[in-house]
Structure formats: C-alpha cells, structure tokens
Amino acid sequence: MNLLETRRSLLEEMEIIENAIAERIQRNPELYYHYIQESSKVFPDTKLPRSSLIAENKIYKFKKVKRKRKQIILQQHEINIFLRDYQEKQQTFNKINRPEETQEDDKDLPNFERKLQQLEKELKNEDENFELDINSKKDKYALFSSSSDPSRRTNILSDRARDLDLNEIFTRDEQYGEYMELEQFHSLWLNVIKRGDCSLLQFLDILELFLDDEKYLLTPPMDRKNDRYMAFLLKLSKYVETFFFKSYALLDAAAVENLIKSDFEHSYCRGSLRSEAKGIYCPFCSRWFKTSSVFESHLVGKIHKKNESKRRNFVYSEYKLHRYLKYLNDEFSRTRSFVERKLAFTANERMAEMDILTQKYEAPAYDSTEKEGAEQVDGEQRDGQLQEEHLSGKSFDMPLGPDGLPMPYWLYKLHGLDREYRCEICSNKVYNGRRTFERHFNEERHIYHLRCLGIEPSSVFKGITKIKEAQELWKNMQGQSQLTSIAAVPPKPNPSQLKVPTELELEEEDEEGNVMSKKVYDELKKQGLV
C-alpha cells in the first residue's frame, strides 16, 4: 500500500476513535466529570475549565438521563481500550517516514498534481470497497455494535470491546469501585499481630494512619522492621494500587506511577519529613537527624545504604499505600460507613442487603428501556413545555442553587423570583424577586446611571425607578437646599447688644465634681464647706 494511503488510513481511524469517545461523553457527561475530579486530586496543577463553563456543563449534565454506576465504569474501561488503540496508531503513524520523492518535490506543484491524479485513477475503481472499509471501521467503535441483533440494542459496548466484562475486574463487594474489599486483609492482619482482639473497625482505624503524612511512619501499628508487617503491607499496597486504577480507568497509569516514583526518589528518600524540634527523619533507618549536614553524611554511610538496599521495596510500597489511600479517601470513607451499617444489621437485614448488592452486580450495564438520542430529546422538550407553562412562556432558565444545579421551581416561586421588577434608570433592566430588586439600589450599576443623569445618589432615591420622577425629586431637593442655606446664614451681631453673663450664669465645680453657680460656690467657700 502507498505510504500516503497508509498515513491517511491511520489518521482516518484515529478520527473515528475521537468521534466515538466524544459521542460517549456527549451521551453521558458523568464519564468526564468522574475522571476530571480524580485527576485534579492526583495532579493538582491540572488546568480545570472556567467556573462559568463548569456551571453550564452541570446544567447540561442535569438535563441528561442518570446512568448506572456500572454503565459509567464500563464505558470508562471501553474508552481506555480506545485510547490504547489511538496511541498505537499514533506511534505507527509517527514511525512511517514520508517518501523521499515527496520530500524533494514538496514545493513542486505540478509534480504534486500529477501524483494526485495518479492516486485518483488508482482509487477510482475502489470507491465501493472504500465506503465499506470506512463503515466497518465506524461499526468497530460504534455504540451498541456488539449487540447480536442490530435492530435491538441489548449491549451498549462496541464491537471492539465486545469481550469486556466488569464482573471479571470487580468483585461483588467492591460494587464497581464504590467500596473497597478490606475484610480479606483484616483476616491477614490478625495473623500478623497473632491476636484475635482486633475488630474490623479497629483495623480500619489502623489504615487511617496512612491517610496522614506522618502518623504511619512515626506511630506505626507494629515495628516497621517486622517481616510479617512488611509482607502484609506489600500485599495491601498492591491491592489498593490495583483498585485505584480499575476504579479510574481513564487516568494515565504511567503518568501517575511516574509522579509517585519521582516524588519518592527526589523528595521522600531525601528527608521530606522534617521537624523543628527533632530534625530530619530517615524512612529507611527509622531515625531522626538533628541537622541537614548530619543527615547528608548519613545518606552516604554504610548503614544507610545497607538498610536502603534491604528495605527499599517495603518503604516504596508503604509510600505508595499512603499516596493511593489519600487519592481514595472518599472510597475509604464510604467503605467504613458501609462496614458500620453492616455491623448494625440484624441477620435478616444483612441478607437483604447482600441480595441487593448481588442484584446490582448481576444486572446488565444497559437497560433496553433507557432513553437514547431522539427519545431523550423528546423528554427534555416535554420538561421544557412544563416549565414554559409554569413560567408564562419563559424558557428553562432557573438560577443555580448552592450545588450548581438549577433551583427547583417550587423554591423559585417561594422566594418570589417569578415576579419581575423593572428599573427604567438602569436601562429597563428586569430584576427577579423583591430582594434582588431592593438590593440593586445600592449596586454600582444603579449608582452609575443616577450620576449619568446628574443626580448625586442618596438613600432618598431608593425605590424610585422612573427617570422623570428621579429628576423632579432632584430639582426639589436642589431648591430646598438653596432656601435652607439662605435661612441658615445668621445676622451679624450688634456689639452694643452683646449680653454679658451674670454671676448666676457662671458655674463652678467643687472637688467632688458638684456643679453650681459662681455666687453659691463663693458663699460656700467662705463658710469652709467646699
């Protein structure tokens, strides 16, 4: 096959994969939100969309049909397969070199046209096969293409991911990443400590130490050099890491592993745990060193190198357990709550709960009664019509609540937001609700428009929305202020009419603070009473 045709075919397949991924995210935006929320935890520098765009997308997601968790995780694993195919084709594309004659004749337009005509002749008789090839590629990644009967949509997976089975990836108790199956490790932990007095909740308390950056090192449940403890942590760390990647299939596993390994090599091993009182902690030797110089000399010593070579795998697994458990903090909290509920169940309640989990686990990821495409749009249109009836011809334009979703109509009406108030001064802007309307008189917009009318804003103008009324009030205020200023000017006093204060009008104060006239004060002073 011609190299140009090979490159074109690869680009075509990559574009088909891109469209297939976009189609799934458009159908169910939760696929993207489930990924981006965890990605921002793992990679804090992730550039998130603008807050306004997130709010708009939340409304968009709100209008979509709510899908089951099993379906969300299943499609994420399917998209992960698509991404692997995409990367393979991209690598193949990059390895294919362009023909030498094309490189030499890049700027020769006649030669390029001649080669193009030659290609057209070669492909003229292959149009039908070409169309069939494109359709087969599209069907390979299309939704529901794995269904045995094309007329009945029974399996949401594509033909490419036909063999994908989530029940082979998750156990029943894990519920597709909702809970962690830690009871098996509780049994192993009892064998490690050689005691039977540690309950499952106490074991979960021990695991909570790994959510803290220091406690699992400084206050470990056992001696960190104990062989049984080391073997146990290796198994637990492996499980938590596997659980993380199968719960968040869209995260780049290589990038996450490289990030954790880089932090371990360049920060953790170099004494990331520091204390002003104790100094620097060495995780391999479990010792504190007072100063940086002492710690640096310790790193090149024989004892440290021996401990590092002997315990490196354990310390790295311990660190990975700490990091992945922090990423899975929500799942760990849900697991703990679920364990507490199970312990409070009676035998019958426990059996009923297990039956519910089994039904969810065995139920298909896709239900044939789910709305798709035009059916979903029709449902949205019906909802819109109901809202139009409620809002007297308005579209579905509810303000957002604290959760970022549109406010329910009953709450919208309860706050009086269905009532409109128009302000002519603010260019006929309409305010919904009395509270918003009252507040706008103190806002910059209203004050600015008053000043544009030549009016100095004050509380007197609160409640006035008509331009004419505001101007008339301002003129009246100006006239009254002029009259008041004239009346406030006092006449010049006549020096001959100035009144001289008498002795009775003058006041004195004794040592105790009593105030009296000067005449009375003088009399009392003569008598020695003050």
UniProtKB/Swiss-Prot annotation:
Q: Where is the composition biased (Basic and acidic residues)?
A: 368-388
Its subcellular locations are: Nucleus
Q: Pfam families under this entry? A: PRP9_N, SF3A3, SF3a60_Prp9_C, zf-C2H2_jaz
Compositionally biased tracts (Acidic residues) = 504-513
Question: What coarse category fits the chief subcellular location reported for this protein?
Answer: nucleus
| One Gene Ontology cellular component | U2-type prespliceosome
For the region Disordered, give the residue spans.
Answer: 367-388, 488-516
Keyword Transcription regulation attributed: no
Which InterPro entries does this entry report, sorted A to Z?
Answer: Matrin/U1-C_Znf_C2H2, Matrin/U1-like-C_Znf_C2H2, PRP9_N, RNA_Proc_DNA_Dmg_Regulator, SF3A3_dom, SF3a60/Prp9_C, Znf_C2H2_jaz, Znf_C2H2_sf
Q: Where are the zinc fingers (Matrin-type)?
A: 280-310, 421-452
Database matches in Gene3D superfamilies: Classic Zinc Finger
Entry keyword set: Metal-binding, mRNA processing, mRNA splicing, Nucleus, Repeat, Spliceosome, Zinc, Zinc-finger
Alphabetical list of PROSITE patterns matching this protein: ZF_MATRIN (PS50171)
Q: Which GO terms describe its molecular function?
A: RNA binding; zinc ion binding
GO terms for biological process, alphabetical = mRNA 5'-splice site recognition; mRNA splicing, via spliceosome; U2-type prespliceosome assembly
Q: Which SUPFAM superfamilies match?
A: beta-beta-alpha zinc fingers (SSF57667)
The family assignment reads:
Belongs to the SF3A3 family.
Q: How does it assemble?
A: Belongs to the CWC complex (or CEF1-associated complex), a spliceosome sub-complex reminiscent of a late-stage spliceosome composed of the U2, U5 and U6 snRNAs and at least BUD13, BUD31, BRR2, CDC40, CEF1, CLF1, CUS1, CWC2, CWC15, CWC21, CWC22, CWC23, CWC24, CWC25, CWC27, ECM2, HSH155, IST3, ISY1, LEA1, MSL1, NTC20, PRP8, PRP9, PRP11, PRP19, PRP21, PRP22, PRP45, PRP46, SLU7, SMB1, SMD1, SMD2, SMD3, SMX2, SMX3, SNT309, SNU114, SPP2, SYF1, SYF2, RSE1 and YJU2.
- Other known facts: Present with 3920 molecules/cell in log phase SD medium.
Tell me, in a sentence or two, what this protein's role is: mRNA splicing factors, PRP9, PRP11, and PRP21, are necessary for binding of the U2 snRNP to the pre-mRNA in an early step of spliceosome assembly.
Protein name in UniProt: Pre-mRNA-splicing factor PRP9
Task: Give the species this sequence originates from.
Answer: Saccharomyces cerevisiae (strain ATCC 204508 / S288c) (Baker's yeast)
Q: Which gene encodes it?
A: PRP9
